[in-house]
C-alpha cells in the first residue's frame, strides 16, 4: 500500500516528455489524469503529470519575482491562513503554490521572523513599564458665577417709584386713584405703566368724599362731579374715626 508501481520513472522531466504532455492536454483537455499516462505513453504516474502541468507547463503561469502588491498580499494571507500555499496561490492569479512557497522561504520568512521578535519585545516593554509614558492631564472644572457686593446691593435697593396724583385732579363719586409707576429694570427702562391702585387701607377716603358728608355744596357738571373741599372738616372727621378706633 502506498508504493508506486514498478517501472515508473521519477526525477526531472525531459523536453520530449513535456511536449507529449502538452499535446495530450491540448487534445483532451485538463482532468482525468489517470488516463494521461496511457494516452501519452509516458512512464509517469498521474500525480506527476498533474503537478508538471499545473506548476510548469500551463500557459497562464507567470514567471519572475513577485511585485510589491503581490508580496503585501502574501504577507496578509499568510497571517490569516498560515502555510496553506494552495489557498494563497489561488488569490494570486498566474502564481502557483510552489512558486509562492519558494518565494516565502527564500525572501519573506526571515523578515517575518524579525517582525515577530520586534513586536514581542515592544509588548514586553509596555507591560514592564506601564506608567513610564503616563502624562498628567489638567482637568478644567466649571465654577459657579460669583457676583460682587456692589452689584448685589444695587439689585436689592432697586424699587419702583410711585408718583401719586393730587386729590383735586382725580375725585368723583366712585373714587379711583390713578397713579403711574415707573420700574427701573434693565429690560424696561424709561417706560410708564398706568395701573389702578385699589388698596384696602385707602378705602376710608370714599366715606369722606360721599355727598352726605360734604353736604349740598356739590354741583353736577357735564363731565362729572366737582366737590369744593373743606380740609378742616375732613381732618376733624379723620380725628373722630381714629379716636373711635383707639
Curated annotation (Swiss-Prot):
Residues 5-61, 62-112 form the HTH myb-type domain. Keywords: Activator, Developmental protein, DNA-binding, Nucleus, Repeat, Transcription, Transcription regulation. GO terms for molecular function: DNA binding; DNA-binding transcription factor activity. This is Transcription factor MYB113. GO terms for cellular component: nucleus. Residues 33-57, 85-108 bind DNA. GO terms for biological process: regulation of anthocyanin biosynthetic process; regulation of DNA-templated transcription. Interacts with BHLH002/EGL3/MYC146, BHLH012/MYC1 and BHLH042/TT8. PANTHER family: TRANSCRIPTION FACTOR MYB113-RELATED (PTHR47999:SF93), TRANSCRIPTION FACTOR MYB8-RELATED-RELATED (PTHR47999). CDD domains: SANT. SMART domains: SANT.
Amino acid at each position: 500500500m502506498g508504493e508506486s508501481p514498478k517501472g515508473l520513472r521519477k526525477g526531472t522531466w525531459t523536453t520530449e516528455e513535456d511536449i507529449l504532455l502538452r499535446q495530450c492536454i491540448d487534445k483532451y483537455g485538463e482532468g482525468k489524469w489517470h488516463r494521461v499516462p496511457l494516452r501519452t505513453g509516458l512512464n509517469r504516474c498521474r500525480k506527476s503529470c498533474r503537478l508538471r502541468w499545473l506548476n510548469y507547463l500551463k500557459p497562464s503561469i507567470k514567471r519572475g519575482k513577485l511585485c510589491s502588491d503581490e508580496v503585501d498580499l502574501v504577507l496578509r494571507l499568510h497571517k490569516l491562513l498560515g502555510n496553506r500555499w494552495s489557498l494563497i496561490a489561488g488569490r494570486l492569479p498566474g502564481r502557483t503554490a510552489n512558486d509562492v512557497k519558494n518565494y516565502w522561504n527564500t525572501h519573506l520568512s526571515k523578515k517575518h521572523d524579525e517582525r515577530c521578535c520586534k513586536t514581542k519585545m515592544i509588548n514586553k516593554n509596555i507591560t514592564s513599564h506601564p506608567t513610564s509614558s503616563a502624562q498628567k492631564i489638567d482637568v478644567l472644572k466649571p465654577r459657579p458665577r460669583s457676583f460682587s457686593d456692589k452689584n448685589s446691593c444695587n439689585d436689592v435697593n432697586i424699587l419702583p417709584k410711585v408718583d401719586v396724583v393730587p386729590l383735586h385732579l382725580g375725585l368723583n363719586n366712585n373714587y379711583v386713584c390713578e397713579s403711574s409707576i415707573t420700574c427701573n429694570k434693565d429690560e424696561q427702562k424709561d417706560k410708564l405703566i398706568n395701573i389702578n391702585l385699589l388698596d384696602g387701607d385707602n378705602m376710608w377716603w370714599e366715606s369722606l368724599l360721599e355727598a352726605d358728608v360734604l353736604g349740598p355744596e356739590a354741583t353736577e357738571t357735564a363731565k362729572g362731579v366737582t366737590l369744593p373741599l373743606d380740609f378742616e372738616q375732613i381732618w376733624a372727621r379723620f380725628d373722630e374715626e381714629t379716636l373711635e378706633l383707639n
